[in-house]
């Protein structure tokens, strides 16, 4: 929850995040990862683009992975992405309190065939994928609880603007 979702990351932000990798990445590996992450954002484009809802904790909005100017640019990028009809951004402020799985970044991918749903957990050594019914039910419950504590889309945009003004 301390990083913004990869699909919403601005190129400079991606680079700053990967500079913190342990062990450190070679310049070539860093640029390769940046290029891949930036190209991956294309999934949000086009007529067949999926509808995506991103739940973002205030901690991720306030985490510093570079200079204030770059962070402002990243937050402005979030606002621009939230203008897309297939992108919904909802912020969970600190005031919402704790929630299950607070320490991990979770991607829940669902579609018309429920048996193909998958959960991706980002961990320091890579990603873990879960598809067992019990795991899916648990993570769906976690996300439902998080959604209850998040601001709506318009208040979330206002919140992001407020964070930008704090910089």
Regions of interest found by a model, annotated:
Residues 1-167:
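Hydrophobic protein-protein interaction segments
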